[in-house]
Regions:
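Fungal secretory targeting signals
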Residues: 1-23
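Intrinsically disordered, flexible peripheral segments
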Residues: 19-340
Length: 340
């Protein structure tokens, strides 16, 4: 039943806009994205207020289970999940998705900054049991996104399909601006925001050495594959760091379909986009015009994406080609990074 619903929703999304997005303006003054701890206290407060603002606005996506604009983004990601992971357009689909979220914060909620990112590698420890990474500014209860969820014991093996060990929470977030009395989700059953910190995943999957390996890949196809690696936990992958390090077994961020329900999603994927952006800077003339990887998940011997492959994020924005999305200073996207 769920699969049928997903396929039906994907069909509807495909019809929303059949023509790639073409902006009439070029990027002349790109917002500069910064790491969370680079922001002042006022800038952090403004960003969080803008996220909360989205939850007060009426939805526009027309998708089931949406009560506000924040829900729109979660619903679009959820409906498209089967076709946007372990594919050649994974990184660029999510680049466009985060940029559209950033645009909504700025244009609909008056946010004056750029989308921040969370560089988890700065705090990853070689001591895999260390919890220091969860005691950093981004989890601050007053100026950050709050901390872990309440402890929930896992009694049904079906709730832990990957047999992950070391989970420390799983219930509703207990501190910060997204506790149940201040923030509720509505898509796919909704409820409170949940987190479930797993230190060994956060520390190992966020290691700078792993980022360096991803950024050492010689072409887009190998970069994209290294970014996601394989869909299990026998090998680390940086995409899984924030998702399963902070989302764990039972947390929102660890749910492949519903992960944008945690506002940290956009800072986590902002960092993955920064890593892509930095990789592109190594050979920008080439990497502004280079894509690869499968159209269908895991179909590495099948058809590959091309520069004119179209990305569709439903009613969140018009369609765009991968070539347009390779350029963060072009006719569709307009932002840059401060990596100091």
């Amino acid at each position: 039943m769920r699969l049928a619903g997903v396929l039906f929703s994907l069909a509807l999304l495909h019809l929303v806009s059949g023509v790639p997005h073409r902006s009439r303006t070029t990027c002349s003054n790109p917002p500069v994205r910064k790491e969370w701890r680079q922001l002042s206290a006022d800038e952090k407060a403004e960003y969080i207020a803008a996220v909360q603002c989205l939850t007060t606005l009426d939805p526009k996506s027309g998708l089931e289970g949406t009560a506000n604009r924040f829900d729109d983004f979660q619903a679009v990601h959820s409906n498209q999940t089967p076709s946007i992971h372990w594919v050649g357009h994974f990184a660029l689909w999510h680049r466009y998705f985060v940029a559209s979220y950033e645009k909504s914060l700025r244009e609909e909620c008056g946010y004056t900054g750029a989308q921040p990112y969370w560089n988890w590698s700065l705090d990853a420890s070689t001591n895999l049991s260390s919890t220091a990474i969860f005691e950093t500014e981004i989890f601050d209860p007053d100026t950050g996104f709050g901390g872990n969820g309440a402890w929930v014991e896992i009694t049904d093996p079906a709730d832990n399909p990957f047999n992950l060990t070391g989970h420390t929470g799983g219930g509703c977030v207990q501190t910060g601006p997204f506790t149940p009395d201040k923030f509720q989700l509505h898509h796919s059953g909704g409820g409170c925001l949940k987190r479930d910190f797993i230190p060994w995943i956060m520390n190992s999957f966020a290691a700078q050495s792993l980022v360096d390996w991803v950024q050492s890949q010689p072409d887009y196809t190998s970069f994209a594959r290294a970014l996601e690696n394989i869909p299990d936990f026998s090998e680390p992958n940086i995409h899984g760091s924030g998702h399963f390090g902070a989302g764990g077994v039972l947390g929102t961020l660890g749910n492949q379909y519903e992960s944008p329900g945690d506002p940290l999603f956009y800072l986590h994927h902002g960092n993955l986009d920064r890593i892509l952006w930095e990789w592109q800077q190594q050979d920008l003339p080439t990497r502004l015009h280079q894509v690869g990887g499968p159209i269908e998940p895991f179909d590495y011997s099948g058809k590959n994406v091309t520069l004119d492959f179209t990305v569709n994020i439903g009613a969140l924005a018009g369609n765009a080609t991968l070539e347009q999305l390779l350029n963060t200073n072009g006719d569709v996207l307009c932002y840059t990074y401060d990596t100091a």
